């Protein structure tokens, strides 16, 4: 392994890993710290299903799978799902929950860069949700995802925009006022503008096909998808190699 590939294989922020390991046991508590993920998961899943033309019997990789919320839901749609994460505790929770639920998901503790080196063009669909803002080099993750998907396959990213509105809503509002997620979950400096993400995508065989925002209304306590990408957003890309 050369210096570049070694660096890519260690694209890990151990402080970020520790944050999620500390609360891993409550990953499937529908009223706990991960309640927002449980609530937005149907929106994310439906978006993936619609844009990818369904995932039944397709090979799917969930990068940064955590405790397996999205991975399990995709497996229930008939996909052959692999979940990738660097947190040992979240993966253990994911494996136990899959066993209890009777869902078949292969969970692996490995960086996406390392997985890409061994599995080029292996997957029909790759998802990378709420993960890019938690690693030192998000562009490296985008490149690895592009390497993992088959020509014609689909890659989905979701992250948080970097601007004052996003800081007020995703950090001040969600962490300190509404207490929807633990304080310190997000670092505004690590948020990613859509132009930055698309710039990284354009440096690969992936091409942007669609972008959509994810909105939360604190008055109605309701999540929905919409055109505004000021805060949370998802991007659908396709490998055109």
Swiss-Prot record:
It catalyses: a 3-demethylubiquinol + S-adenosyl-L-methionine = a ubiquinol + S-adenosyl-L-homocysteine + H(+); a 3-(all-trans-polyprenyl)benzene-1,2-diol + S-adenosyl-L-methionine = a 2-methoxy-6-(all-trans-polyprenyl)phenol + S-adenosyl-L-homocysteine + H(+). The keyword Methyltransferase applies. One of its GO terms (molecular function) is 3-demethylubiquinol 3-O-methyltransferase activity. Signal peptide: none annotated. Its EC number is 2.1.1.222, 2.1.1.64. InterPro entries: SAM-dependent_MTases_sf, UbiG_MeTrfase. It holds the Pfam family Methyltransf_23. Pathway: Cofactor biosynthesis; ubiquinone biosynthesis. CDD domains: AdoMet_MTases. It is an enzyme of class 2 (transferase). Keywords: Methyltransferase, S-adenosyl-L-methionine, Transferase, Ubiquinone biosynthesis. The keyword Endoplasmic reticulum does not apply. S-adenosyl-L-methionine binds at residues 44, 64, 85, 129. One of its GO terms (biological process) is methylation. O-methyltransferase that catalyzes the 2 O-methylation steps in the ubiquinone biosynthetic pathway. NCBIfam families: UbiG (TIGR01983). Belongs to the methyltransferase superfamily. UbiG/COQ3 family. This is Ubiquinone biosynthesis O-methyltransferase. The lineage of its organism: Bacteria, Pseudomonadati, Pseudomonadota, Gammaproteobacteria, Enterobacterales.
